[in-house]
Amino acid sequence: MRFLVSGGGTGGHIYPALAIARGLKNRYPGAEILYMGTSNGMEADIVPAEGFPFTGISASGLERKLSPRNLLALWQAVRGFCQAVEIIGRWRPEAVIGTGGYVCGPVVLAAVLKRIPTLIHEQNALPGVTNRILSRFASRVAITFADSLKYFPDQSKVRLTGLPVRPEILQADRKTGLQKLGIKEGRFFLLSFGGSRGARSINGAMLTVIKAFAGNPDVEILHATGKAGYQKFLDGCRAAGIELDKIGNVTVKEYIYNMQDALAAADLVVSRAGAATLAELTALGIPSILVPYPYASENHQEFNARALEKEGAALVILDRQLNGGLLSRTITELINDRARLQAMAAASRKMGKNRALEDIIDCIDELIRSKRRHF
């Protein structure tokens, strides 16, 4: 069996596509996967490194204002569509899967033209422009948040599957996580991070939080600054009189490589509101304080965060409102109100979709079986 997978532009589109590709390989032993993206996008480097064949087509994003660049983008879309039609005609996949990004436009439309079943997956609560358009033509739409449903005209083809979560996250457990981190059972463990590159606003607020809890025997803090903000954060600690090597209950790192252990052990998380992060938090039932990245396209991180807030799984502090005092008070209130924290954890767990990958593959399998019945 052959499958074509597409998604590009950002890791938020690429990694779900790769997860689905692996899921297809597991479900259909011997299946061949071809990944189609843009030759100059992140996917051109990431996908081959993950062991999947990659082919590039022409595609670029439209600007939201009138611009000469949009003429070039339209030309590239037409060219990319023709390239996709030729490649799909040659490859003849059983199904085509798109996870978003402008490259998916020509790929999915080419598959529709060739009468090949198509599934698109939307990671965010506010669907991207490409997926909103493609939903009119795709055979099936898989969504991560129930809040997304209202944005798709034909809701009969929409399935709430969730976002695939890394197996190591799903397999992690609290006791092992605490042991690996060297944290005593019974201590309140606060985990904070701002994504792989860190977040300046969260770093700034966490300085105040660390100062407030420095030396507290009942609270343990692990904060990841991101590479760019690491030295500045250490300098800020010194300027604030925080001696990290002496206070004993705070660990500061550039990046957390064993995130599965940190998440499994966490009682509370402070983070941005990217779809992958929220899928991991809800898979493990972790309550959170979310600070959406304010410059995400169409402000989609705030929509993601509000979806958790609405269900009682998270508190939301907007980036422009964030300061050390507010964050410190909010954390203290939650530490002192364990009933509320437990209710947030239960709400988070209820939102978790631990079978997301299996459910997405089931949708694809359903499309394949349906096509075979009709031909």
Curated annotation (Swiss-Prot):
Biological-process GO terms, alphabetical: carbohydrate metabolic process; cell division; cell wall organization; lipid glycosylation; peptidoglycan biosynthetic process; regulation of cell shape
Predominant location category: membrane
SUPFAM superfamilies recorded: UDP-Glycosyltransferase/glycogen phosphorylase
InterPro entries: GlcNAc_MurG (IPR006009), Glyco_trans_28_C (IPR007235), GlycoTrans_28_N (IPR004276)
Subcellular localization(s) per the UniProt record: Cell membrane
Enzyme class: transferase
Cell cycle in keyword set: yes
Reactions that this protein is recorded to catalyse: di-trans,octa-cis-undecaprenyl diphospho-N-acetyl-alpha-D-muramoyl-L-alanyl-D-glutamyl-meso-2,6-diaminopimeloyl-D-alanyl-D-alanine + UDP-N-acetyl-alpha-D-glucosamine = di-trans,octa-cis-undecaprenyl diphospho-[N-acetyl-alpha-D-glucosaminyl-(1->4)]-N-acetyl-alpha-D-muramoyl-L-alanyl-D-glutamyl-meso-2,6-diaminopimeloyl-D-alanyl-D-alanine + UDP + H(+)
UniProtKB keywords: Cell cycle, Cell division, Cell membrane, Cell shape, Cell wall biogenesis/degradation, Glycosyltransferase, Membrane, Peptidoglycan synthesis, Transferase
Pathway of action: Cell wall biogenesis; peptidoglycan biosynthesis
Membrane-traversing stretches: none
E.C. numbers: 2.4.1.227
Protein's membrane topology: Peripheral membrane protein
UniProt-listed Gene3D superfamilies: Glycogen Phosphorylase B
Residues reported to bind UDP-N-acetyl-alpha-D-glucosamine: T10, G11, G12, N124, R166, S196, I256, Q301
GO cellular component, one term: plasma membrane
One MF term in the entry's GO annotations: undecaprenyldiphospho-muramoylpentapeptide beta-N-acetylglucosaminyltransferase activity
Annotated function: Cell wall formation. Catalyzes the transfer of a GlcNAc subunit on undecaprenyl-pyrophosphoryl-MurNAc-pentapeptide (lipid intermediate I) to form undecaprenyl-pyrophosphoryl-MurNAc-(pentapeptide)GlcNAc (lipid intermediate II).
Protein family per UniProt: Belongs to the glycosyltransferase 28 family. MurG subfamily.
Record-linked NCBIfam families: murG
UniProt name for this protein: UDP-N-acetylglucosamine--N-acetylmuramyl-(pentapeptide) pyrophosphoryl-undecaprenol N-acetylglucosamine transferase
